[in-house]
Amino acid sequence: MTRVRADDYDDKRQSILDQAAALFARKGFEGSTMIEVAQACGASKSHLYHYFARKEDLLFEIVRVHITAQLDELETAVNQALPAEERFDRYVETFVARGANSRNEHLVLMNDIKFLPDAQRREVRKLENRIVDLLVGVLHEINPELMPARSPRGPYAMLLFGMIIWTFTWYEKSGAIPPRELAARISQLFVYGFKGQRFAPPAPSKR
């Protein structure tokens, strides 16, 4: 007979994900145990296994849910009928808002994905690649000379992406700069230089 799920199954499952993300962000995946996750949830270890059989399953679901939601939000941001620069602003604002509001999950994604089995890690990387590709498309519209349609991603998208993802190792949304202002600063810092950039190779070294 198939077991009937309780009405609050999804809520309890999400609560476990939230508590585990906070624990992993603070102590690291490797330094945390399922017993500690259960204690953080105010539940028994056996109760936890009703939702997640292994710690790796818990880690995968934390990063999968986080990055899938982020991808959905970013697709909405860049698919609006707006000029490319405005869609770029929306992309950065959306990325910053998600990172600021899901800082634990973001840190777990950055620091602990290496502990996932290969197949699950590849699945997460594919989602990350789609997020970067959205950015590449918008940057191509802003400055096709620097981002030719048939070229590889190039340094520009990855420079910006790297800058944004590492922001949340130090940024706290409760600090002096709110997320929306931070996003505007990032957008302006990057796009004003990128839009007018014409690449000139450095002069040969005399050494």
Report each predicted region and the residues it spans.
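Short, hydrophobic secondary-structure boundary micro-motifs
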Residues: 107-110, 148-150, 172, 201-203
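C-terminal peripheral helix-coil segments that are non-catalytic and often amphipathic
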Residues: 1-2, 97, 101, 132-141, ...
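Short hydrophobic/aromatic patch on the recognition helix
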Residues: 41-52
